[in-house]
């Protein structure tokens, strides 16, 4: 397996990216914190978002000292604690970063929401944080529950669109409000019409909360969800989970990077999506003991699995090429008025 690529001074874990097709360059956005905080686990509560670039995930240009804090908590804003995993997309007039954060004064300080930041320059070291706060609602747990195996989950947004439906969808790592404690991990689905996207980004219009993409009743957490196309026509819903939270009947408790095949995602009438929310037929793409977590499939590299090194930190290729293909993540025709 290829070596982990380390930042010269920071501990690095979850990442997401935008691929510049003209330059053939990956813009990586990554969580990072002081290495001195790792042993105590406090790095999760001091994380900011950094920016780096790479041609192939074999070598990474980490930029200068300003590059590891391009997005960080803002005093006086609801996102006043550490920043957690997100997604980045290009729109006609710039770039949007969907991210996870918390209001430290709310509940136990661990209640999460999705926020949005904007820049017109992907190389910028200062993103403009919008006031938008997308909170958990509908069937999804709104705060931590006493006795649960893990705290609240409403994080790790992943966006795609179906142009034929004029709809934009967002997946979110979540928990069911009425699920069994310790088995309530789920993947939420939200949507908004193309015409309302700009208003939804600025908080002037609401997202529609749909039934979960997955609510199998056998995971405490289903983190960093993503959706891809399989070359043979199905779709693959992927996510990460730790072995100690994996109670699925088909995975032997291995945890790690897993997937669920969705055979008929697209309805013939092109109205909505047909997930398999109760299916327990998960496959392990890479078990936790391979020491990669919060993995992403990189369609531009033959669907190779890339994640962060859960032992040493840093970003590492797996050498495993799934051949999974990207959903439509082209938002370049949409103008967002910020």
Residue ranges and their predicted role:
Residues 1-338:
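Carbohydrate-active catalytic/glycan-binding domains of CAZyme proteins
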